Design a protein with these regions (language model features):
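Extracellular/periplasmic helix-loop-helix junction of adjacent transmembrane segments
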Residues: 1-20, 57-62, 95
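C-terminal ends and interior cores of transmembrane alpha-helices
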Residues: 42-55
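Cytoplasmic helix-loop-helix junction between adjacent transmembrane helices
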Residues: 65-101
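Helix-breaking motifs and short loop linkers at transmembrane-helix boundaries and internal kinks
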Residues: 32, 53-59, 121-122
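Membrane-interface helix termini in secondary transporters
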Residues: 25-26, 30, 116
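Hydrophobic transmembrane-helix bundles of small-molecule transporters
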Residues: 97, 119-172
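Juxtamembrane helix-start motifs in multi-pass secondary transporters
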Residues: 33-39
Length: 172
């Protein structure tokens, strides 16, 4: 793989994630946050599974972009679900604090675990970790998370979503 391809393996996730984040959050508010979370988990899990079997750098880049779409649905839906489920202000603040701490810890621990997996197995293993976790998360979501959506059913601003996504991608 070229140096540029290796950089895109890293950047494809972030660029697509950033570009899709606002639209994914809006879709979750309109059509259901639990539904958006499950869709995000499925897309992320399938992208990760496919990345684990990638045979070319271009295929891996595409899989990382798919994972970015999934992540863009997961992040806003989880935060919105917390806000809906925890109605007490103190409990909500604590839940959001835990959510942020777990996300921060994952960002710090992920590369360490990934490095250990690569050192002792194969690079493919860093992507094979996610699908079993995704299955557990989907089961837990159906068992524990109530469906919620914005009761005002806001109109989806397609042009605004496209322009903001393009702008964010260009900025990133």
């Amino acid at each position: 793989a070229t140096t540029a391809q290796l950089q895109w393996v890293v950047d494809a996730y972030s660029v697509v994630f950033a570009g899709a984040l606002l639209l994914a959050g809006s879709l979750g508010d309109r059509f259901g946050r639990r539904r958006a979370l499950v869709i995000g988990l499925v897309v992320f899990g399938l992208g990760s599974l496919a990345a684990g079997f990638a045979t070319t750098a271009d295929m891996l880049i595409l899989c990382r972009a798919v994972m970015g779409i999934g992540g863009a649905f997961i992040m806003p839906s989880t935060l919105s679900i917390l806000v809906q489920v925890f109605t007490d202000r103190q409990a909500r603040a604590q839940a959001i604090g835990i959510w942020a701490a777990v996300a921060g810890a994952a960002i710090a621990i992920g590369p360490i675990v990934g490095g250990l997996l690569i050192e002792h197995t194969t690079w493919h293993a860093i992507f094979w970790v996610n699908p079993p976790l995704v299955v557990i998360a989907i089961i837990a979501t159906f068992a524990l998370v109530p469906e919620s959506r914005d009761p005002s059913k806001p109109r989806l601003d397609v042009m605004g979503a496209v322009l903001s996504s393009v702008g964010i991608i260009a900025f990133v």
